[in-house]
Amino acid sequence: MTITRHARIDWDEQGNPRSRDFSDVYFSTESGLDETRHVFLVQNDLRRRFSELPEDGRLIIGETGFGTGLNFLCAWQLFDECAPAEARLQFVSVEKYPLSRADLQRALALWPELSRFARQLLDQYVAVHEGFQRLAFDDGRVTLTLLIGDALQMLPQLDGQIDAWFLDGFAPAKNPEMWTPELFAELARLSAPSATIGTFTSTGWVRRSLNAAGFKMKRVPGIGHKWEVLRGTFIAWPEDVAHPPAAKPWFARPAPIGGERKALVIGAGLAGCATAQSLAQRGWQVSLLERHAAPAQEASGNPQGVLYLKLSAHGTALSQLILSGFGHTRRLLERLQRGVDWDACGVLQLTFDDKEAQRQKQLADAFPESLLHLLDQPAAEAQSGVALNSGGLFYPEGGWVHPPALCHAQAAHANIRLIAHQQALELRRVDDQWQVWSDEQLIDSAPVVVLAGAADIQKFSQSADLPLKRIRGQITRLPQTQASAALRSVVCAEGYVAPARLGEHTLGASFDFNSTDLTPNLADHLGNLGLLREISEDLTSRLDTADLSPEQLQGRAAFRCTSPDYLPIVGPLADREAFLQAYAALGKDARQVPNIACPWLDGLYVNSGHGSRGLITAPLCGELIAAWVDNEPLPLPRSVAEACHPNRFALRGLIRGGGK
């Protein structure tokens, strides 16, 4: 993997930023705002297009070169001024060298007229690392998806249709690696019919190359020191160029659901509450069904969960999901109460054996220090506040979360109606609606249903074949002592222990693949105390565990729900028997791509199987579900979305023989 680093910036005497990497300015030092508005807003006719959006409409802007965010903020300001109240703006921007938060703050201070929007951007500009990073503003009415990396590596991973392009970035002479026919072909691939484009350069070869890619470009008068700029419209993919390959039918997008924007989400844990909020923010009226009295009563109900990134140095689909999901969750948490609902105290993963030391060294070589870095034993002790036997890998942006707080915050959206004490047992399809039944009682119906009830979704015939498994886990709660208050970071080895929340530490957690009894038991409490001793004998002593009688040990048990490949199961569901019949030829030749549309169960989706990573993966997967439902750009690389797709299991079964 290539380590993404921050932009290297020099500042002139007037405080304007200049890229040291490209020897170029980020914006005109004479008329930056006017130039941005003329080149990108005017040439894409955004004032009219924003004003004419329907109440529930949206416009999607794509950009090359996020830079200081000036173009985004100007577009947001115009959208806020003239778009209907319920309309939405989605902005997707690629950036190879993101500014540090301090540099971004300094640059945006130059534009006081944008301060209301800049302040919100800065509040959310945390944990912005490599890959797809989703930021949300104004209760989700405006979203920004940053693709952190090289444009020619990131844009091919994007799945979506762009209505208007801001072709920015440093000048072609300064950044020739970006301004290429390959880039223009990606813009064409991603363009919606009649998409528009504006760019500050009027260079002849850029105009000709964009024309060759399927755009119709023309020179128009510029502004300031720009005599001319380019504007254009996407006409069609060039006839003499092979079309980019379409998604395989089993991973293609289902047809959007028209008509009533009502959805049912079954299960009010992390996955269900996140999905409900993501849909509600898009104007859907959501019924959130929960068999208990309130959200977050099962695995999402632990007093503390750890925001910990178990990454791979090799850029696997799971690692990409974790990195994007971590950033998304961290930004959500900024809106909750620190110290009660969550805390960014950092997470220290101890180097407890040689294999772990080797793994940590590989990760430290693969990722930036701002995400993770190695600490020797004295530094680890200083960071954690307790005596330790080893150093480890420190995640400064990690910490602990009170999962119920996140669930309740998400479920509190005005468009969400919680239906508690309802056990959904059966789904029936009647007149383009999904009916949810409990015994012989109809609970509710809607054109869209999302199954988010962990392994319980296997009781529905439509999802019974999904290979979900339960793993019992038990945590132990220990009262804080005056001495244990020294613990300043979450510390992990085979188990974990968190700094106290409301006078209690959480430690755990057991893994039991066989038990189905959720009654907390002494054996697992003692096992958790053993994990604590492996972390720190000093902390064990500080917590006075030797003086605790068995009946004083408190905790709770719940089932983690995971899949065989440890990736969550997220996306639209197909009719399994029809799927096996439609693609039976794959059993003889896995290279075939039958020209047969996938037999979707229209309007039925799943968000489950997050295992012990739900805090990191479930919220972003709620956004992924909403993108599938509303035909939006996916918030993850297409390859990662396919790796999480429910159809992957039936597909593997066919290829390996028989679909079983």
Swiss-Prot record:
Region feature tRNA (mnm(5)s(2)U34)-methyltransferase, mapped onto this chain: 1-235
Tree of life domain: Bacteria
Gene Ontology terms for molecular function: flavin adenine dinucleotide binding; oxidoreductase activity, acting on the CH-NH group of donors; tRNA (5-methylaminomethyl-2-thiouridylate)(34)-methyltransferase activity
InterPro entries documented for this protein: FAD-dep_OxRdtase, FAD/NAD-bd_sf, MnmC-like_methylTransf, SAM-dependent_MTases_sf, tRNA_MAMT_biosynth_bifunc_MnmC, tRNA_MNMC2, tRNA_S-uridine_synth_MnmC_C
One Pfam family this sequence matches: DAO
Subcellular localization(s) per the UniProt record: Cytoplasm
Stretches the record annotates as FAD-dependent cmnm(5)s(2)U34 oxidoreductase: 266-660
Keyword Repeat belongs to the record: no
Listed GO biological process terms: methylation; tRNA wobble uridine modification
The enzyme's E.C. designation: 2.1.1.61, 1.5.-.-
Gene Ontology cellular component annotations, sorted alphabetically: cytoplasm
Reactions that this protein is recorded to catalyse: 5-aminomethyl-2-thiouridine(34) in tRNA + S-adenosyl-L-methionine = 5-methylaminomethyl-2-thiouridine(34) in tRNA + S-adenosyl-L-homocysteine + H(+)
Names of the cofactor(s): FAD
Keywords, ordered alphabetically: Cytoplasm, FAD, Flavoprotein, Methyltransferase, Multifunctional enzyme, Oxidoreductase, S-adenosyl-L-methionine, Transferase, tRNA processing
HAMAP family listed in its UniProt record: MnmC
Biological role: Catalyzes the last two steps in the biosynthesis of 5-methylaminomethyl-2-thiouridine (mnm(5)s(2)U) at the wobble position (U34) in tRNA. Catalyzes the FAD-dependent demodification of cmnm(5)s(2)U34 to nm(5)s(2)U34, followed by the transfer of a methyl group from S-adenosyl-L-methionine to nm(5)s(2)U34, to form mnm(5)s(2)U34.
Similarity annotation: In the N-terminal section; belongs to the methyltransferase superfamily. tRNA (mnm(5)s(2)U34)-methyltransferase family.
Protein name according to UniProt: tRNA 5-methylaminomethyl-2-thiouridine biosynthesis bifunctional protein MnmC
Native source species: Pseudomonas savastanoi pv. phaseolicola (strain 1448A / Race 6) (Pseudomonas syringae pv. phaseolicola (strain 1448A / Race 6))
UniProt gene name: mnmC
